[in-house]
Structure formats: structure tokens, C-alpha cells
Amino acid sequence: MKGFKILEHSDIEKDLELYHRLGAKKGVYLGFKSMKDFYSMRESGVTDWTGYPSSGKTELLLECLFNTANFYGWKHLLYVPDIGDEIEVMSILIHKYSGMTFDKKYPNYISIQDVWRSSSWLLEHFKILKKTDPKASITPIEFWDFAIECKKEFGIQTATIDSWKDMRHDYSLHGGYAQYLSHVLPYRNMISEQHNIHLHTVIHPKTPRRQDGKIVHPDVDDMEGGAQWNNSGKVIISLHRESKEANHVDVKMLKIKPKIVGKWGFFAINFDLSKSRYFDINSEIGGTKEYATKEIIESKPNSEAISNYQLDNPF
């Protein structure tokens, strides 16, 4: 049958021997103690990020990508029109890299020399896809196929879409949105595994739900086509904060697959606007801010997460 075959020993011999010797491949540690047990990132995988505008989802995603570049030398493909043009994207990355801002009203206003130094390193590790024709558009599948070409050319480990709404979606060819997602998301999973690349997607929720006058932290069902995202997704992360002024961000792990990369649950993290960096608060030493570090190279297998996992659940 075209596009399929019966599995043979030669197809899996090498990978199965490696799995027997090393076990399931863990993700790399992303620098935060608060996140350690809940989420790690490995090269083959997909992560979907959701949250209302100004929830911090893009900032945390970029922070995780920046940390993997800084700690492990990873390279990333970005198609992020939701952030803004290429200058806006670079200004955010430069702020993270240097700890200095382009806003003149702050004492850590960056010099042009630091801009050039930062840009050189960042453009080596972040391959930013720029639209040159205002009429041009790209489908998710076209982007993911392009990411595989970039992996061959530049050695990238991840590719990011921010956001899903900025892609061209040919719903009518598949009988509607739900059927469309059922077509494109399994394709994403397959090429991620085949080509050992991590694919990130930012998806905006639908109209906010309210409870007691407050906006509710979005769940999978708040995503357009939530059932399909839940069925085909691997890792789904939802961010929420009570107000745009708050630096405290609540993070829910709505789905984790495979279990070796994290666990379901909730953690909190904080954002330092002056540095454009996230941090943990160490209450044991007077509420000290702890920014991401590479002290722990990889997340260790989480025995609690494994023990809490329903072993009779094949998914």
C-alpha cells in the first residue's frame, strides 16, 4: 500500500538497541527549578503553547529556546509574525541575550556596540524567516517541510510557528476545520519523529471564559478545535496571569507525551521586565531571584511522575 509498509527487523534494529542501552530519551533541562519536573525539551517532539494575549506564552517559549541555544548550542527556526517584524523579534532576543533594553528611559539602555555583538550570536542560533512579498503565504505543512530543509542546511533542532492564525489554512480542501486539523497535526507528529526535530506552535484561545468576574485560565477546550489538538498533540502548555501588569505567571501542563519529558500539573514562574527574563523565587534565601542556569544538565527521570502515571493507559 502506497505510503505504508510492514515493519521489519532491519527497520528498528539500530534504534531498538539504542533504546535498550540508554532507555527513553529525556529532554534537556531548561534552566528553571520550578519547571524541571513538569517540562523538558527534546529534539523529537511537538509542543503547543496557548494563553490569552499578554499571558507571557511567547516570552516563555522564547526563553526556553534561548536557554537551549545558550546552554547546549541549539539552533532554531522562527516564523513569528504575531510578535511583529524582524526588528521587533531581534529586539526581544537581544534584550534576553544582553539584559539591556532598547528603551531609553531605562538605565540599562543598550549601546550600538552591544547590539552588533548580540546580533552576531543570535543570528547564528536563530534563523528568522522573513516575508519579502506581502502577498506571500505559507501553510503549516509547507513550513514544517521547510524546517526539515533548514535542519539539513543549518543544523536546527526546533522550528516555531507564532501564531497558528498567521498561517494559510486550506480548510475547504478537507471538509472543515476539525477535519483539517485531523490531517495536518498527525503529519507534524510524523515528521518530528522521522527527522528528530521539535516543532512548537502558538495557538490563541477562543473568547475568554469568565468566572466570578475573572478570566479563567484557558484549557484545551478553549482552543479552536480543542479536541483535535488534544488528540494529536504531545505537549500542551497553557499560560495565564491575572493582569497585564503582573509579573507572576501561572503555567498549566495540560498534556504530556511521552511521560519521560515531564508531567501534568501546575507551576508558577515570574517575569523580569527590565531583563526580559523569567526567574524563580528562592524563598529559602530571602526571596532571591534565580534566573535560568545550566547547573543541572538534564532532567533526571521523575519517579513521582512515573508512579503517578496510569500504567494501564497506553497513551
Roles of regions detected by a PLM:
Residues 32, 36, 71-155, 266:
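Cytosolic-facing regulatory segments adjacent to core modules
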Residues 56-57, 84-89, 166-170, 207-211, ...:
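Flexible loop/turn segments at secondary-structure boundaries
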Residues 81, 204, 241:
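Cofactor-binding loop segments of dinucleotide-utilizing enzymes, especially the Rossmann-like FAD-
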